[in-house]
Amino acid sequence: MLDFEKPLFEIRNKIESLKESQDKNDVDLQEEIDMLEASLERETKKIYTNLKPWDRVQIARLQERPTTLDYIPYIFDSFMELHGDRNFRDDPAMIGGIGFLNGRAVTVIGQQRGKDTKDNIYRNFGMAHPEGYRKALRLMKQAEKFNRPIFTFIDTKGAYPGKAAEERGQSESIATNLIEMASLKVPVIAIVIGEGGSGGALGIGIANKVLMLENSTYSVISPEGAAALLWKDSNLAKIAAETMKITAHDIKQLGIIDDVISEPLGGAHKDIEQQALAIKSAFVEQLDSLESLSRDEIANDRFEKFRNIGSYIE
C-alpha cells in the first residue's frame, strides 16, 4: 500500500469486515456495503486525479507494475526472444526479439525488472550491463538490415554502475547506442513504462516517437539522488520530484516526449490487458504516422527531433 492510498485501505477494510459479518451472522448489510463501495470509487477517483509527482514516482516503482514481458504477449504475436551480444554474454536485464504487430514483423527490445526477489537478482533489478546495451544494438542493426520497425520499452533505474560493468565499458556501450540509434533507417518507437533513469534509459530511447505511461517517470537522476546532491539530504526527495519535472505530463509540456498514454484507475497493474491494448493502439498510430517517410527521412526525423530538444536564453 502506498502512503497516499491509506484512505482507500481503510474503506476496503470496512467493506471486507461488513462482508464477513454478513456471511457469518446471516444478516443483510448489502446497503451499507454498496454505500462504502460507492465511497471507495469516489475517493479513488479523487486521489488518482490529484496525484503529486512523488506519488507517481511511487507508482512507477511498484513491484506489481507490469514489465516488458508482461506487455509483449498482449501487443505482439509470435514473439521469439533472441539472446547474447556476440561479445561477452547474454544480459537478462535487457530482453529483445522478433514478433508481429498486426501482421508486420517488428523488433522488440526492453529492460526487464524481476517479479520477486529471486527474479530481481537474475534480472539485476532491470539495470543492464554493457552487454545488455550491445545486445540491444545488435538487434537494432539486424532490424535495420531487414527493414523491421523497432519498439523499445524503457523501465530502469539506470544502467548498472558496478565495477565489472565499468571495466567492460558501460559508458562506451551507451554512447555507441546513442550514436547508432540516431542514424537507424527504420522507424523507432519508444515507451517509458515505469522508471526511465538517466543514460540507462537513453541507451534504448533515441526514437522517432517517445511515449510515456501516465504514471511513469523520466529523469537524469532519481529524486533521492538529486536531493542528496543539491541539498545534501535524500529525505527531500519529494521536493526534488516536484522541482525536476519528471512526470509524463510535465515532460510532454517540455516537448521531450510525443504523447502520454492514460492508465487504468489505480495504475497499469490494475488491468494489464487494458493497458497493453492502449499501448498497442498508440504503437500502431505512431508507426502509421511514419509510413510516408523514406529510410533517409526516418533517420533525419529522429536526428532533428533530438537536436531540437531543449532551450536556452541569450
From Swiss-Prot:
The record's subcellular locations are: Cytoplasm
One cellular component term (GO) for this entry is: acetyl-CoA carboxylase complex
Q: Which reaction does it catalyse?
A: N(6)-carboxybiotinyl-L-lysyl-[protein] + acetyl-CoA = N(6)-biotinyl-L-lysyl-[protein] + malonyl-CoA
Q: How does the record describe its quaternary structure? A: Acetyl-CoA carboxylase is a heterohexamer composed of biotin carboxyl carrier protein (AccB), biotin carboxylase (AccC) and two subunits each of ACCase subunit alpha (AccA) and ACCase subunit beta (AccD).
Q: Does the keyword Cytoplasm apply?
A: yes
Tell me the organism: Staphylococcus aureus (strain MRSA252)
Query: Which family does the similarity line name?
Result: Belongs to the AccA family.
Q: Which UniProt keywords apply?
A: ATP-binding, Cytoplasm, Fatty acid biosynthesis, Fatty acid metabolism, Lipid biosynthesis, Lipid metabolism, Nucleotide-binding, Transferase
**Protein name from the UniProt record:** Acetyl-coenzyme A carboxylase carboxyl transferase subunit alpha
Single GO MF annotation: ATP binding
Stated EC number for the protein is 2.1.3.15
Q: Which domain of life is it from?
A: Bacteria
- Gene Ontology biological process terms in this record: fatty acid biosynthetic process; malonyl-CoA biosynthetic process
